[in-house]
Amino acid sequence: MDTLKVALQSCLSLGLVTAAALPAASLDLRETGRYELNRPASLEYDPTFCGLWIANEGPVAVLVTLEGEELRHVTSDLSRIKAITIEGDHLLVADGFGGMQRLTKNGEILGPPFRLAGGFADTEGIAVAENGDIITVEDDPERLSWFDASGGIKTRVNTLELSTPLTEAQGIAIDPRTGHLLIVDDWEGSNSLYEFSADGELLAQANLYEYGTDPEGIAIRPGSNQLFIAFDMGAQIVTFDYTPTLPEGSAPLPPGADCMMF
């Protein structure tokens, strides 16, 4: 984590992310479809069911097929479910105020709610790294934070100090093949998708106005290079073919987790 912090501080102080520094293989999005859903605020792809977990800031989170048909729903002891992610073989949900709880995918409670360390957090999106760290994005104050599995703070970054400021971060996903962090910034910010390396270097930014307004959630299906972005305005989820930023000359990425039902 010290290496991560040094890399981030280096980006902030030296402004390393310039057009000349970007690799030849840059972030690329190509829209493949869209469907309507009621206020999709947070997304997570589940390869076990070949579907999406969706939180919409209410008391219930739902699992839907990739066509938008509901498969099941879960509730928690939190006042609402603002963000959702998969942690191992279960779910981790957040209320948006720093509270979290673990549930089975059948909705059984695995433990009481717990709070993230470090004071109040306007948690908009959550993801779990390969090493078990909980990564959150917050928009008031504007932060990207790393916690251990129990909620202890490890590292926190002010995203306003990035070479390209991230002012209204909402959703976060991690590409398991690269470790890259994919974060959407809503329309009060830049209405963009940001891509960070696993070490915290800002790799790319893609404007999303061509596809929708007010992005809130993001999920990745690495087995098919598919990305899902939820837009609040219009209440739609847009699907994309997705190519991550890679160093020049890199071999194509191997497939990641895909549908286990087929």
Please name every model-derived segment:
Residues M1-L12:
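Bacterial N-terminal signal peptides that target proteins for export
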Residues V60-V62, G99-R102, R143-W146, S192-Y194, ...:
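A short loop-to-beta-strand structural motif that recurs across blades of beta-propeller domains
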Residues Y35-F49, D77-G88, F97, A117-D133, ...:
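Beta-rich, blade/repeat-based domains predominating
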